[in-house]
């Protein structure tokens, strides 16, 4: 099978690894920043010229993809960039297609639409306390803190506003807006909560939740000036009683959106409060950027799960206790201890690059001279962790107040 993958930064990396391991499959992919890591694993990255063609306007992208499919006998088109969901409309009947439909992509690119779906199915959402246009004279003024600023109908990250200085900075950066008449809304910030993530697969009108987690500290990096989320964050499993409630609420949402079509992986972020309530916050209709998770299944099982029987995903994740360890260094020029992944059979991170035969965190994972990445796998041995801690200068993030 020949695969063309069009993704955001490395968010299908671990799925592509499964395809590239087999002589049955040939993988082509776009890329961001560098190509050395992917190429080392037999993932054929597009030329710089062809990679740039995917940044052109819609009609030219469709034309390029159509030519590429024909010239390279592509059997499977995998698209995780929600701004290119129009490719689903054009190619869904021509090749096997993994990715959201145009309607589904709006769940990520149109935050009001995603909130409306939640409200429709009885899932709580934070209150909207202000709306307007970025060009309005009162943008980000007269707020009570903390609060969250979100674009209403265009794709851009939410901004946590913790104090007046954050709001002033947001106003200062308004000149960067391409479309000042775009709408925004200010959402209440739920203080008494833990941030939860739910990961899922939708295929052929059905869905399965693969895993859940609690993430601590990421919200502090989602400020006016977005920071690298690896720094200062910590991930751990949800407590069983919390997991039960989160999955129950997630089911309501997933039952609705699975009717909208598409075959894709996704996740959403929610807030669980001390009173046992869960609030829907945001949706991604693709795997996480620079944070893909091992699939725990072969490439052929992955394809069968997407197109024939979604229970392949259920079986793959059964009894999997996923661990996600954030690891950082204060010097981004220090070599990453890649050899220990081979030694202890631990899944490799996805945001590395290779320079002179050595592994380093890619530019996407660096900030202020430091860097970080994430190690995701099940049954990560204590010996692996111990050897990194005792023989390298890399450090694992610790649970705050843990």
Which ranges hold each PLM region?
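ATP-dependent carboxylate/phosphate-activation module, predominantly the ATP-grasp catalytic core
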Residues: 200-255, 284-316
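Glycine-rich phosphate-binding loop of ATP-grasp-fold ATP-dependent ligases
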Residues: 146-173, 194-197, 217-238, 373
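Conserved metal-phosphate-binding beta-hairpin within the catalytic cores
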Residues: 251-292, 322-335
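A conserved helix-loop-beta module that forms one wall/lid of the active-site cleft
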Residues: 92-160, 164-165
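ATP-binding N-terminal substructure of ATP-dependent carboxylate-amine bond-forming enzymes
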Residues: 1-101, 389
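Peripheral (often C-terminal) accessory segments that flank ATP-dependent C-N-forming ligase machineries
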Residues: 137, 305-402
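Conserved ATP-binding module of the ATP-grasp superfamily
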Residues: 124-126, 160-193, 228-232, 251-258
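Phosphate-binding site of ATP-dependent enzymes
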Residues: 169-223, 267, 271-279
